[in-house]
Each structure stands twice: as structure tokens, then as C-alpha cells.
UniProtKB/Swiss-Prot annotation:
Recorded GO CC terms: cytoplasm; membrane
UniProt topology in membrane: Peripheral membrane protein
Name under which the protein is recorded: Rac-like GTP-binding protein RHO1
Record has Membrane as a keyword: yes
UniProt function note: Inactive GDP-bound Rho GTPases reside in the cytosol, are found in a complex with Rho GDP-dissociation inhibitors (Rho GDIs), and are released from the GDI protein in order to translocate to membranes upon activation. May be involved in cell polarity control during the actin-dependent tip growth of pollen tubes.
Gene from which this protein is expressed: RHO1
Lipid sites, type S-geranylgeranyl cysteine: 194
Length: 197
């Protein structure tokens, strides 16, 4: 077995969209019932991919505005970002392009982003929308449209509570680092030959 490769994966997104729950669900197969706003937490998980061990360093960030100046410190050295929004929060969906993409492009240009819609279990929960009349669900088509807009290689909807697609989120993050999508080559003007006289 070859030596393990370290991949730094940073989760970002609005406060209360489920970033910490996603990480806890992935690393411990449990769902936390209490909401505690994150300052910064790190997790580490060894994952075997195609016979090679990958040490996946998982960095959690706080989405609240109070941390706007502190949060980018965790971006340094990131190999991939998981950009999360809630499938039951139109504001968090809109902030992907309004707030998060500009921030990531400024502090970590060129780092791939996996777009993730969280709280999939609540999107189809009629009782949730009765209890929260202002909530607006985000459709899969809207998520896919946003993925194209921000040029993300993948969009995944998941539920940390039911574990649906949780592993798929991190598999996609690992895959985009180990096998980056081929960049379309720009047609360059004919290269000039160098002549030595």
C-alpha cells in the first residue's frame, strides 16, 4: 500500500446550514441534536481510495458574519472546498454566489469547490413547511443551475440526519483532488521559436 496523501478539505457556507452536522455525520455516523455555532474544529479521517490511503483533513468553519475576518485563515493550503447551503433556505442558496464564491475566489483562487445542498430530509417534509411558512425549498434543478453558474465540478444533495449521500459528498471531494477535471486548453497563438545566433 502506498504512503498516504494528505487532502485538506474545508467546509464553508452560511451559519446553521449544517456544515458541522455533515462532518460529524461523516466521521462518527451520528447526528448531533443540539445546535452549537462553530468557531473552528478540525477532524481527520483515513480513507482508502483505489488501494491508496488518503488522510482527509476536515476543517469546519463558522459562517456567521462575526467570523468574516478570522475564517479565511483556515483557507490556506486547502485542496478542496465543500460549499454548503440549506435546501430549505433561499437566503443560504443566494449567498453561495453573493458571498461565498467572491470570498473563495479572493482568498483561494483555483481551488475546486463541491457544491452541497444540505437538509434533504426536510425538503420533502410537509410538516416542516407548515411549521415554517416562510421557508422556501430549493429544487435539484436550481442546485444544478447554481453548480453551472459557479463552475463547480459536482453538486450533491444530502441529509446528515438520515446519512443519505453523506459519503458521496466526501468521495466527490477526494475524487476532484486526486483526479482533477481536465481543463479546456485555450488556443494559444503560434509559439515563437527561439533562435540562438
Amino acid at each position: 500500500m502506498s504512503a498516504s496523501r494528505f487532502i485538506k478539505c474545508v467546509t464553508v457556507g452560511d451559519g446553521a446550514v449544517g456544515k458541522t452536522c455533515l462532518l460529524i455525520s461523516y466521521t462518527s455516523n451520528t447526528f448531533p441534536t443540539d445546535y452549537v455555532p462553530t468557531v473552528f474544529d478540525n477532524f481527520s479521517a483515513n480513507v482508502v481510495v483505489n488501494g491508496s490511503t488518503v488522510n482527509l483533513g476536515l476543517w469546519d468553519t463558522a459562517g456567521q458574519e462575526d467570523y468574516n475576518r478570522l475564517r479565511p485563515l483556515s483557507y490556506r493550503g486547502a485542496d478542496v472546498f465543500i460549499l454548503a447551503f440549506s435546501l430549505i433556505s433561499k437566503a443560504s442558496y443566494e449567498n453561495v454566489s453573493k458571498k461565498w464564491i467572491p470570498e473563495l475566489k479572493h482568498y483561494a483562487p483555483g481551488v475546486p469547490i463541491i457544491l452541497v445542498g444540505t437538509k434533504l430530509d426536510l425538503r420533502d417534509d410537509k410538516q416542516f413547511f407548515v411549521d415554517h411558512p416562510g421557508a422556501v425549498p430549493i429544487t435539484t434543478a436550481q442546485g444544478e443551475e447554481l453548480r453551472k453558474l459557479i463552475n463547480a465540478p459536482a453538486y450533491i444533495e444530502c441529509s446528515s440526519k438520515s446519512q443519505q449521500n453523506v459519503k458521496a459528498v466526501f468521495d466527490a471531494a477526494i475524487r476532484v483532488v486526486l483526479q482533477p477535471p481536465k481543463q479546456k486548453k485555450k488556443k494559444s497563438k503560434a509559439q515563437k521559436a527561439c533562435s540562438i545566433l
